[in-house]
Structures are given as C-alpha cells and as structure tokens.
C-alpha cells in the first residue's frame, strides 16, 4: 500500500527555511497510522537537511522552452507508472490535478492559500472541474473554503467532499512563571506581515517601557525596513526548534498582517506556548488563535495601544495568556487523526 504526497515545486522540505506546509506534514505524518506507507515527493536544494527519510527529491532538469513545473510533474508521473499509489495527496497546486488525474483518480487536493490566487482554481469553471475530479478537497481554514466557494453552487457549502483541516502543532509544556518581558515578532519582515507598523510601534513602546525587550525573528531580502533600539534584537532567520524556545519564554506575540492570512502559523505556535497574542482580524488568522486580541484597523497607534494594555495590566496579561493556552486544541494528534480518517475511507473505496 502506498500513499503519495506531492509538494508544490520549490516547497522546501528541509530544516533550512522550512515552510508551513513542510512543517505540518512532518509533524502529522509522524503520528499517522500510515506513516510507513507514505512517500513525500518534492524538490529542494537543501538535500542534507531533509525533514523525513521517506522523501523523494524529484529531478527538475529541463531542456529549452520546457516549464520547470511540467518537468517536475512528469518526473513524479514516472515514479507513479513504476509503482502506482493507492492515494495521492496534492498540496496547494490545483494545476497538477489535470495531468495526475490521467493515471490515478484517487486524489485529494489541499489548499494552504487563497484558492482564488492560485493557478488552476482562479475561475469558477476551474473550481467546478476540481470538484468533479478529486475525491476530497481540504482547506486550511473556513476562510479559504469560503473563498473557494465564491460563485459555486450553494449545495456544496455543507458537502463532505469539502473539509476544513487546520494546521496544527504540539501544545508545549510551559511555565507562566518563566515568561519574560519579551515582545516577539516572527515572520517575513515586510509590509504584508505588517513589520513596518510593528517597527514604528515597538520603538515608541521600548522608550515608554525600558524594562521590556523586543525580539524579531525572520528576514526579507526583497524589502528593507530598518529599526534600531538598544532593547530591540533582530535575530534573522532561525530554525523552527529555535523559534519555539522563544515563544515559550515570551510574554507577548504580535502577528499584525495586512494581507488576508489563509490561516496563521505564527499565531498558532504562539498560542500553543501561552503567549498573549495580538493579531489582525484578517483572513483565517482568528481561526489560528480564537482568543487572541484582534485589531480591526491596523495602524501604529492601535497596535501600540493594545500592546501597552497588556504591559500595564499584569492581571489582564496573565488571564489572556492562560485563556489562550488552556483553550488550545489544534494539536498534531487531533489533526493527524482527522487526516487518517479520510485516508482510510478513500483507500477502502
């Protein structure tokens, strides 16, 4: 028995710059009852730091005028022709469905981003065609599912073929007494993530509250936002296991995205570590941390005001941290079971 998981081309299934999809698969496959039957197909240049042994790095060598994506899929199909799969799970690339469907019709399609922004699911016709072809479509959040359903027949709203299975993480063992006066920002240091607004707010806050520090983890080579303060530490990119340690000891985590986050891995991780989480009310972010403070209108003043409230009111901060932590339910165990439930049904059918 074989289950094939195909990643988007360039999804880095490695501890170096691992994306949210890679982290999710690593954690849930380890807990799957089918873990010995699963093969992951992808492409990365970081071959020394692969996250799992059952990974196949597909060749992308091409000739002139060939699409790298087409070469990538063709190489996957070569593997499939040699040893066919009982089930194929396609992640975040609806345009892969057409070619894979020709040789295997037991397909599951995952959406980790807004379907309306992805090649192969932008139009109503494309989305209707996907519903006809694949056995199941999995969405990272209700928000991404609702985006997919725009213009689709209302009968599909409660159709079991379309299911929300969120990302997950381990609920960390923490001590609230060991939390430190740290304001944490994790993510790409760009305007989409609201880093420019965070930077402007944080320098003012650190002047007002000199016994607090701010830590920034992440990078962004395409944008350059420079903020300096003696209590502001910018660490650059760090591996996931290192980032988790900072979440565990930080009092406050800020996820102030401008764009509609499909879900919000950072908010999820912060919640699992009992941070007082501040998010923008955008996209699927509220689903990642339902009890977080939500900012409806993002600007430096509003962000600064909400962080200040947590800093000044210690009782409010502690209650918020415990409420977020105690109500955290999106564990890897829960999500791995949900995934295995549909696998069992589709393999038997």
Task: Describe the predicted segments one by one.
Residues 223-241:
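Nucleotide-activated donor-binding/catalytic signature segment of Leloir-type glycosyltransferases, i.e.
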Residues 237-238, 246-250:
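Short alpha-helical donor nucleotide-sugar binding micro-motif in glycosyltransferases
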Residues 120, 127, 132-160:
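A short, active-site helix/loop in glycosyltransferases that binds the activated sugar's phosphate group
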Residues 276-279:
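Short hydrophobic beta-strand element within catalytic cores of glycosyltransferases
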Residues 7-15, 24-67, 96, 158:
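N-terminal strand-loop element at the rim of the active site
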Residues 4, 138, 175-193, 199-202:
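Conserved donor-binding/catalytic core segment of Leloir-type glycosyltransferases
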Residues 292-301, 309-315:
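Conserved acidic donor-binding segment of nucleotide-sugar-dependent glycosyltransferases
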Residues 90-95, 111:
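Short His-centered aromatic/hydrophobic patch
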């Amino acid at each position: 028995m074989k289950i094939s998981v195909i990643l988007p081309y360039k999804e880095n299934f490695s501890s170096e710059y691992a994306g949210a999809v890679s982290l999710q698969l690593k954690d849930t496959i380890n807990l799957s009852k089918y873990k010995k039957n699963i093969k992951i197909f992808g492409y990365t240049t970081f071959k020394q730091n692969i996250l799992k042994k059952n990974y196949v790095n597909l060749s992308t060598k091409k000739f002139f005028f060939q699409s790298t994506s087409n070469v990538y899929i063709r190489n996957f199909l070569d593997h499939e022709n040699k040893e066919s799969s009982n089930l194929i799970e396609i992640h975040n690339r609806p345009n892969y469905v057409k070619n894979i469907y020709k040789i295997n019709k037991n397909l599951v399609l995952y959406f980790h981003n807004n379907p309306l922004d992805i090649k192969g699911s932008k139009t109503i016709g494309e989305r209707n065609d996907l519903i006809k072809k694949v056995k199941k479509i999995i969405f990272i959040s209700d928000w991404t599912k609702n985006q997919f359903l725009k213009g689709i027949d209302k009968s599909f709203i409660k159709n079991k073929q379309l299911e929300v299975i969120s990302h997950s993480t381990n609920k960390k063992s923490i001590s609230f007494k060991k939390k430190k006066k740290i304001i944490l920002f994790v993510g790409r240091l760009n305007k989409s993530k609201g880093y420019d607004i965070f930077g402007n707010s944080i320098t003012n806050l650190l002047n007002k509250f000199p016994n607090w520090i701010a830590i920034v983890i992440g990078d962004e080579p395409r944008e350059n936002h420079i903020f300096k303060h003696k209590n502001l530490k910018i660490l650059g990119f760090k591996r996931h296991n290192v980032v988790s340690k900072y979440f565990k000891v930080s009092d406050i985590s800020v996820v102030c995205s401008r764009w509609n986050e499909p879900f919000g891995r950072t908010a999820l991780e912060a919640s699992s570590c009992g941070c007082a989480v501040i998010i923008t009310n955008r996209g699927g972010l509220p689903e990642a941390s339902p009890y977080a403070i939500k900012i409806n209108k993002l600007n430096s003043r509003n962000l600064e005001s909400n962080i200040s409230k947590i800093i000044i009111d210690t009782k409010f901060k502690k209650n918020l941290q415990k409420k977020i932590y105690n109500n955290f339910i999106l564990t890897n165990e829960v999500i791995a079971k949900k995934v295995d439930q549909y696998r069992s049904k589709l393999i038997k059918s």
